[in-house]
Amino acid sequence: MASITIRGVKKNYAKTQVVHGVDLDFASGEFVVILGPSGCGKSTLLRMIAGLEEISDGEISIDGTVVNKLEPRERGCAMVFQNYALYPHMSVAQNIGYSLKVAGVPSAERTQRIQAVARTLELEHLLDRKPMALSGGQRQRVAMGRAMIREPKVFLFDEPLSNLDAKLRVQMRSEIRKLHRRLNATSVFVTHDQVEAMTLADRLVVMNGGRVEQVGTPGEIYTRPASRFVATFVGAPAMNILEGTVELDGLSLLGGSRRLAMARTGLPVGTKVAMGIRPEAVRLVAPGIAGALNATVDLVEELGAGRVIYVDLDGAPFSVMTSEAVHPEPGSQVGLKISPDDMHFFSSEAGSRLDVFKASVPEPAL
C-alpha cells in the first residue's frame, strides 16, 4: 500500500495544455475512481502517475517519494489496460508470470506465486490455455493477475471494463471490488462510466476539460454536486436544469413562463440562476394541481422496476423517474410537483454551486 500526492501537475502537448494544475491526495489503501468524459485528461493523469507520460510541470509522489524522474518499473505501480495486453502465444500461466521471469525469479518461486494468484482470481483451471480460448472476462482477470503477481504498491486501471458486455461488466465490477478488499492495495481507476465509478469508488474525482471539478464520496458527489457539469454528468437520467431568476417570494423559470413559490433563497432579487432537480425527486400529480408545473408527455421508457417519463416544459426537455404505477400516454398532460428542499442552484454564468436557504411557501388548505 502507498499514498499518492499530486501537486500542481500539468501536461502540455506543444502549446496545448491538456491537464491544468491538478492537486490531489490519495490515501494508502484507498480505491479512487477518476471519472469524466472522453478527452477530459483522466487517462493522461493516470499515465503520468504510471510514468508512461512525462509531467510538464508539478510533482507526483508515491509513498513520500517524488517519482517525476523515475522509470515506470521503479515506481511500484502495476497497470491494467482496456485491451488486456496479453501475449497471444503464451499460456495464462506464462502471461501471469512473465514479469517474474524477466526479473530472474527462480522457476519454483514463479510457479508458487502464479498458483497463488490463480487461486485468488479463480483461474486455476485455465492456466494452460492461450488467451484466444478465453472469454473477455477471463482475459481481464488474467490481465489483473499479471498486475497482482508483481505485488505493487499501487494498482492503476485504465478503463479495464470498456470492452466487456453489460453482464460481464457487472460481474467484473464485483470481482474488482472484492479483490481490493482482500488486497487492501491503493487503487486508481479511470472510467467514463458513472455506474462503474459510483459502485467501485471510496472517493470520486470528477474531471472536465483537464481540471478537477469535484472530489468526494459517491454520495457527496450525487447529493451535493459542486458544479452544473457534475450535476448533469453524474446521474442517469441526468439532473434536470431550468434557467430562472430569483424573485422576492419565488423563482421565475423559463423566461417568466413558469413560477415556483419559495419563501426566500438568500440571493438578491434578479439573480440569474440554473435550478437543478433530480428526476427521482419530481412527483407526478394531476395537471392543474396548485403549485405544480403542467407539462406535456413526450416519451415513456419502461425499466421494469419503474419508468422514466420525458416531458416538454414550454420547450424545455425534462425527465421524471418513478416506480409508481402511472402510465401516462404521449401527448397527455401531467403535473410536476417539486419541493424546494430537493432543488440545487448553480450560477448561470460560472456554473458553480450556490448554497442557498430554501423554504417552501405553504400550500393553501383545500
Swiss-Prot record:
Main subcellular location: membrane
Which keywords does UniProt give here? ATP-binding, Cell inner membrane, Cell membrane, Membrane, Nucleotide-binding, Sugar transport, Translocase, Transport
Query: What kind of membrane protein is this, topologically?
Result: Peripheral membrane protein
**The EC number(s) this enzyme carries:** 7.6.2.10
One GO BP = carbohydrate transport
GO CC annotations, alphabetized: ATP-binding cassette (ABC) transporter complex, substrate-binding subunit-containing
Question: Where does the record place the ABC transporter domain?
Answer: 4-234
- InterPro entries linked: AAA+_ATPase (IPR003593), ABC_transporter-like_ATP-bd (IPR003439), ABC_transporter-like_CS (IPR017871), ABC_transpr_MalK-like (IPR015855), ABC_transpr_MalK/UgpC-like (IPR047641), Mo/tungstate-bd_C_term_dom (IPR008995), NA-bd_OB-fold (IPR012340), P-loop_NTPase (IPR027417)
Q: Name the enzyme's class.
A: translocase
Q: Which domain of life is it from?
A: Bacteria
Query: Which is one GO molecular function term here?
Result: ABC-type glycerol-3-phosphate transporter activity
Question: Which family, according to the similarity comment?
Answer: Belongs to the ABC transporter superfamily. sn-glycerol-3-phosphate importer (TC 3.A.1.1.3) family.
Subunit info? The complex is composed of two ATP-binding proteins (UgpC), two transmembrane proteins (UgpA and UgpE) and a solute-binding protein (UgpB).
What PANTHER family does the entry give? Answer: MALTODEXTRIN IMPORT ATP-BINDING PROTEIN MSMX (PTHR43875), OSMOPROTECTIVE COMPOUNDS UPTAKE ATP-BINDING PROTEIN GGTA (PTHR43875:SF1)
| Record's protein name | sn-glycerol-3-phosphate import ATP-binding protein UgpC
Q: Which organism is it from?
A: Mesorhizobium japonicum (strain LMG 29417 / CECT 9101 / MAFF 303099) (Mesorhizobium loti (strain MAFF 303099))
What is the primary gene name for this protein?
ugpC
